[in-house]
């Protein structure tokens, strides 16, 4: 029987890879993990965590403004970009050290360098040149921001660089209409920047419910975001300290910073996939079957590098299930990707689970659509023009709720528990027979008619 250095070797110590490594080690496996950038991966260092901290910061002006209606006479506030960035960096450093400490505490051997596959069971560490073998190899290298091709694209930045800008851009162009793009549009508008958003298509948030996307468009416009649809950059040039943007639609204007938010691509460069025989699709994503198995029997992949559903909790669940199955003898049910809750941290934020209305109409001929639009008690009292929008989709034949789409303050917290109800095949009768909690915006969900 062949002897290996490790039972499992993980490439990538982001949320999914780190979870898989720790769980396997706790089950008694000999585990190694390589990370060429930062422990914690995109989410901790260049994604979810720093972005959410900036979302919190961007909402402070609203709280100050509405405070007057509640009797608070707040003095004029001044935003300090460097203070936020410094505090953010301290928190990210803390979380990264927690990730590495937890891996070491579980008995995982860490290698702070990139790794390349040599064959089905062998990995070479790029900096040191060390070669290690493993019975199984798990690829969890995530994804990276895509960069569209146009003259001057090198003058633009992605979300990777955004979190390290030395100054707040006073004039910001965001290219893209997906959830990351609209989140940053809301953040920088809230922080006082002049924001223009350039969207290639006719609407925001492709893949989300049409009414949710349109309602968000209204709110972003109301908050001062200049939304430009069906246009793209033709040329980007440096003009002194500014950038000159020329679009295919004939627009020309100056900004301080151009942020590219046009999607993400699987991180496969330098992995040696071809040498190992691992198949990728036309988008560069690793092709996997049940349990994350690739076309090579000893090599597996989880998370964004597989381009199935690119969310941190999905990668974590996939990593947990992988190690439980192979090293703990525990069979976890396959993830139901159709019922994964999703949040968009705009202001107001979005929470969705299940089918969109257009998707539901393809599956359910008798679809009941319940929706409401209102201002919350706090919004009305403070004179805010923000609104709450709820939409529930019900299959009339079975009374089962097949989709819930929410926009409003705090709905990301709500959608987590609504997802539990949909996972349990809750009916609309289950929802409306539940006594409402008053006064909340959530009560409107169970009193919809």
What would you call each of these model-derived segments?
Residues 29-35, 139, 193-199:
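Short beta-strand "acidic-cap" motif of Rossmann-like dinucleotide-binding folds
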Residues 90-96, 100, 163-164, 169-173, ...:
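Rossmann-like dinucleotide-binding cores of NAD(P)H-dependent redox enzymes
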């Amino acid at each position: 029987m062949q002897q290996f250095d490790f039972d499992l070797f993980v490439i990538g110590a982001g949320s999914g890879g780190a979870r898989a490594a720790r769980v396997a080690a706790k089950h008694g496996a000999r585990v190694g993990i390589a990370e060429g950038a930062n422990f914690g991966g995109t989410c901790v260092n260049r994604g979810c965590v720093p972005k959410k901290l900036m979302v919190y910061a961007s909402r402070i002006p609203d709280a100050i403004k509405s405070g007057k209606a509640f009797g608070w006479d707040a003095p004029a506030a001044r935003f300090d970009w460097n203070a936020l960035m410094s505090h953010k960096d301290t928190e990210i450093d803390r979380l990264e050290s927690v990730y590495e400490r937890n891996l070491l505490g579980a008995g995982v051997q860490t290698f702070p360098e990139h790794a390349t596959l040599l064959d089905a069971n062998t990995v070479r560490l790029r900096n040191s040149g060390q070669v290690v073998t493993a019975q199984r190899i798990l690829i969890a290298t995530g994804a990276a921001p895509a960069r569209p091709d146009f003259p001057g694209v090198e003058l633009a930045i992605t979300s990777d660089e955004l979190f390290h800008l030395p100054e707040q851009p006073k004039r910001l162009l965001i290219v893209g209409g997906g959830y990351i793009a609209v989140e940053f549009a809301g953040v920088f508008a809230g922080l006082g920047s002049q924001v223009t958003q350039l969207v290639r298509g006719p609407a925001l948030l492709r893949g989300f419910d049409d009414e949710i996307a349109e309602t968000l468009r209204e709110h972003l416009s109301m908050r001062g975001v200049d939304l430009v649809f069906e246009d793209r950059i033709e040329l980007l040039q440096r003009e002194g300290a500014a950038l000159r943007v020329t679009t295919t639609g004939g627009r020309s204007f100056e900004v301080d910073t151009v942020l590219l938010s046009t999607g993400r691509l699987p991180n496969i460069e330098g992995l040696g996939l071809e040498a190992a025989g691992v198949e990728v699709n036309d988008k560069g994503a690793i092709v996997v079957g049940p349990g994350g198995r690739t076309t090579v029997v000893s090599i597996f992949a989880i998370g964004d590098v597989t381009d199935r559903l690119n969310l941190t909790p999905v990668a974590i669940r996939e990593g947990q299930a992988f190690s439980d199955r192979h090293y703990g003898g525990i069979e976890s049910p396959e993830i139901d990707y159709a019922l994964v809750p999703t949040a968009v941290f705009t202001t107001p934020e979005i929470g969705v689970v299940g089918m969109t209305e257009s998707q539901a109409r393809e599956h359910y001929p008798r679809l009941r659509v319940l929706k409401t639009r209102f201002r919350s008690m706090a919004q009305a009292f403070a004179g805010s023009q923000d609104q709450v929008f709820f939409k529930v989709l019900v299959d009339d034949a079975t009374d089962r709720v097949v989709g819930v789409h929410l926009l409003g303050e705090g709905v990301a917290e709500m959608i987590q528990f609504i997802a539990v109800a949909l996972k349990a095949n809750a009916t609309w009768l289950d929802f409306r027979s539940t006594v409402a909690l008053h006064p909340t915006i959530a009560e409107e969900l169970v009193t919809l008619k």
